[in-house]
Amino acid sequence: MRHIICHGGVITEEMAASLLDQLIEEVLADNLPPPSHFEPPTLHELYDLDVTAPEDPNEEAVSQIFPDSVMLAVQEGIDLLTFPPAPGSPEPPHLSRQPEQPEQRALGPVSMPNLVPEVIDLTCHEAGFPPSDDEDEEGEEFVLDYVEHPGHGCRSCHYHRRNTGDPDIMCSLCYMRTCGMFVYSPVSEPEPEPEPEPEPARPTRRPKLVPAILRRPTSPVSRECNSSTDSCDSGPSNTPPEIHPVVPLCPIKPVAVRVGGRRQAVECIEDLLNESGQPLDLSCKRPRP
């Protein structure tokens, strides 16, 4: 490599160009790759993937039984040359060769040997994990039982006792039957038959009102005796009553009552125990004062 001495510490353009040419020729001449078109990197170039798998110990044996050439020939339908098997070579375990015909022993282009399928035992005889108790419990389903005596011989109670470990526990149905809570008779009482509705009464004609004759009473007594007939009007008569000029004090007047289905308001629980002729009102409303 040449050494260039610079006088004054100044490098001219010609000197710099010669230095670059010398560097390219002597250093990068052999290792410089040829220019090529830029291509985007592939997925395998971006990620460092380890595609080398561990060797399979059975790969060589399988390749000898089913070589790639034989598989390709079978797919393409190409006839192969049959040669007698080597002495001591085992036959495939899952295929059996039929006895060769005399005319097939000669060398030449012949068809593939006829293979007969055999039944293969695919059952796994390896000892696995023993079945756990959880699998047996999941397989058993809960069954609601109804027995004559609650808590005795009930499958529902036995299911809960086995799962919880409590020998005195009972299922919900036996508990309610024992305590008498919210248990009704198995057969409901027959509902009363609805009474036939009475036929609507026919409208009756109102009697005609006879206009009353206002007469001035002769005496304060309402009853009068007739002197000509010597009879006294003690009973009811067909004539309307007489109107007196004197009005009695504090007469009893009828009060209109509105018929309703509401019950009387309840202030405390004791009101429910008191016998009352009217039905009780269990609503939240209170009567106005």
UniProtKB/Swiss-Prot annotation:
Subcellular location: Host nucleus
GO cellular component terms listed in the entry, alphabetical order: host cell nucleus
Residue segments, region Disordered: 82-107, 187-245
Motif, Bipartite nuclear localization signal: chain positions: 258-289
Family: Belongs to the adenoviridae E1A protein family.
Biased composition (Pro residues): 84-93
Protein purpose: Plays a role in viral genome replication by driving entry of quiescent cells into the cell cycle. Stimulation of progression from G1 to S phase allows the virus to efficiently use the cellular DNA replicating machinery to achieve viral genome replication. E1A protein has both transforming and trans-activating activities. Induces the disassembly of the E2F1 transcription factor from RB1 by direct competition for the same binding site on RB1, with subsequent transcriptional activation of E2F1-regulated S-phase genes and of the E2 region of the adenoviral genome.
UniProt name for this protein: Early E1A protein
Coarse class of the protein's main subcellular location: host cell
Ranges where the record places region Interaction with UBE2I: 76-140
Complex formation: Interacts with host UBE2I; this interaction interferes with polySUMOylation. Interacts with host RB1; this interaction induces the aberrant dissociation of RB1-E2F1 complex thereby disrupting the activity of RB1 and activating E2F1-regulated genes. Interacts with host ATF7; the interaction enhances ATF7-mediated viral transactivation activity which requires the zinc binding domains of both proteins.
Locus of motif PXDLS motif, CTBP-binding: 279-283
Xref: InterPro entries: Aden_E1A
BP term (GO), one: regulation of DNA-templated transcription
UniProt entry tagged with the keyword Cell membrane: no
Effect annotated for changing S185R: Abolishes ATF7-mediated transcriptional activation
Keyword terms: Activator, Early protein, Eukaryotic host gene expression shutoff by virus, Eukaryotic host transcription shutoff by virus, G1/S host cell cycle checkpoint dysregulation by virus, Host gene expression shutoff by virus, Host nucleus, Host-virus interaction, Inhibition of eukaryotic host transcription initiation by virus, Inhibition of host innate immune response by virus, Inhibition of host interferon signaling pathway by virus, Inhibition of host STAT1 by virus, Interferon antiviral system evasion, Metal-binding, Modulation of host cell cycle by virus, Modulation of host E3 ubiquitin ligases by virus, Modulation of host ubiquitin pathway by virus, Oncogene, Phosphoprotein, Transcription, Transcription regulation, Viral immunoevasion, Zinc, Zinc-finger
Lineage summary: Viruses, Varidnaviria, Bamfordvirae, Preplasmiviricota, Tectiliviricetes
